[in-house]
Amino acid sequence: MKNFPKAMIAGLVATIVLSLFFVMKDAMGIMPQLDLPRMIAGMMGMPDAPRLGWAVHFFIGVVLYGAALALLDEHLPGNSKIGHGVLLATAGWLMMMVVLMPIAGTGLFGLNLGISAPIMTLMLHLIFGAVLGAYYGHALARQASVPLRA
């Protein structure tokens, strides 16, 4: 339980990094049809409320991924925190591709948006997972190096 705050902060940092990639993607005009916050809001019946989509996006990144990392980290194979983050993010990507994309109307793996959709979302999830695991590992290492006070 003591690692939940560290995992949540790691989720926040990773979600901010991922969100910056979303903003850069949109600013460069890359795949404008792949607007994940708007898709999330649309799945909630409010396609014209992208702020709702952003809020849910941050909830997923901070709370769900943070909790998953804190709960599963010690049970995942290997010792690499980056590897654990990437593994969790890849599992999340796969769920997104086979459950959420069809619900959003973009088809299995989002292929109605083109072959770039699953490739781009996988790349973004891999980056997210690497940042998630790296920050979490760094936070745990800092905790281990801080001397206990009497």
Task: Pin down the residues of each PLM region.
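Juxtamembrane/disordered regions of integral membrane proteins
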Residues: 1-150
